From Swiss-Prot:
One of its GO terms (molecular function) is DNA binding. Pfam families: GntR, UTRA. This is HTH-type transcriptional repressor DasR. It comes from Streptomyces avermitilis (strain ATCC 31267 / DSM 46492 / JCM 5070 / NBRC 14893 / NCIMB 12804 / NRRL 8165 / MA-4680). It is found in: Cytoplasm. Residues 47-66 bind DNA. Keywords: Cytoplasm, DNA-binding, Repressor, Transcription, Transcription regulation. SUPFAM superfamilies: Chorismate lyase-like (SSF64288), Winged helix' DNA-binding domain (SSF46785). Global regulator that is part of the nutrient-sensing system. In the absence of glucosamine 6-P (GlcN6P), represses the phosphotransferase system (PTS) specific for the uptake of N-acetylglucosamine (PTSNag), and genes involved in the metabolism of chitin, as well as several genes involved in development, thereby linking carbon availability to morphogenesis. Its main location: cytoplasm.
Length: 254
């Protein structure tokens, strides 16, 4: 594979060799510039066409395209081709619901219930919910969508003892937070949220309509009420190619 080597000079005049630039990276940069000028849904030229245009192999073209798919700049649709992707959904890191976040972006939030039932708390989950190990926990797994597009898989855990009959209450109140407020007079006041990366499992990829192994954003949120009592522990997996999180930072007070 051919590469470019460039050099510069430091303050003493001695040359500084910079990193080699792989050929696929130059192609990737060209494609990236192209995506910034074309509307979402625009088809990308086929691999064969790009290989001929840039006098390179289809393997090199495939590598450039795959990196842009992983980064969320391009979208590959099975049997149709590769297209310019829609801009990522941007979410501020704050204590709001998924519904509030999506509506703030002008998107229509919907959910599909994947599973709901009771599990037995292990030591870790018991500590998070401030219950006895072996206690019952209501586990709710939902597929979160934005204007019909799958965005995340969200799994919520709540103490069955603290919130009796919550499963029945959710039939009346489709919003979990509304049910907690109206039925149990419990509202979230603060939370600790951790963001990590993971790779999409076959099940996650199938539900989210993406590729197995695609980078995901994995969020863990531990929410408390105004008295500092645990309310929920939530583990969410968001599509890394469609989602980004934004935080506003301030310097600590002296």
């Amino acid at each position: 594979m051919s590469t470019d080597v460039s050099s510069a000079e430091n303050e003493g005049g001695a040359p500084i060799r910079t990193a080699r630039v792989p050929k696929y990276y130059r192609l990737k940069k060209h494609l990236l510039d192209m995506t910034e000028t074309l509307p979402p849904g625009t088809p990308v030229p086929p691999e064969r066409t790009l290989a001929a245009e840039f006098d390179t192999s289809r393997t090199t073209v495939r590598q450039a395209l795959q990196e842009l798919v992983v980064e969320g700049r391009l979208e590959r649709i099975q049997g149709k081709g590769t297209f310019v992707a829609k801009p990522k959904v941007s979410q501020a890191l704050q204590l709001t619901s998924y519904t509030e976040d999506m509506r703030a972006q002008g998107l229509e939030p919907t959910s599909q219930l994947l599973d709901i039932g009771y599990i037995t708390a292990d030591d870790t989950l018991a500590g998070l919910l401030d219950i006895t190990a072996g206690g019952r926990v209501l586990r709710i797994e939902r597929l979160r969508l934005a204007s019909g597009e799958p965005m995340a898989i969200e799994t919520t855990h709540l103490s069955a003892k603290r919130f009796p009959a919550l499963r029945r209450s959710l039939v009346k109140y489709t919003s979990l937070y509304t049910a907690l407020a109206e039925v149990y007079d419990v509202r979230l006041a603060e939370a600790e949220e951790t963001i990590e990366t993971s790779l999409a499992t076959p099940r996650e990829a199938g539900l989210l309509g993406t590729d197995v192994g695609l980078p995901m954003l994995m969020l863990s949120r531990h929410s408390l009420d105004k008295d500092g009592r645990p309310v929920e522990w939530v583990r969410s997996v968001y599509r890394g190619d469609r989602y980004k999180f934004v935080a506003r930072l301030k310097r600590p007070q002296d």
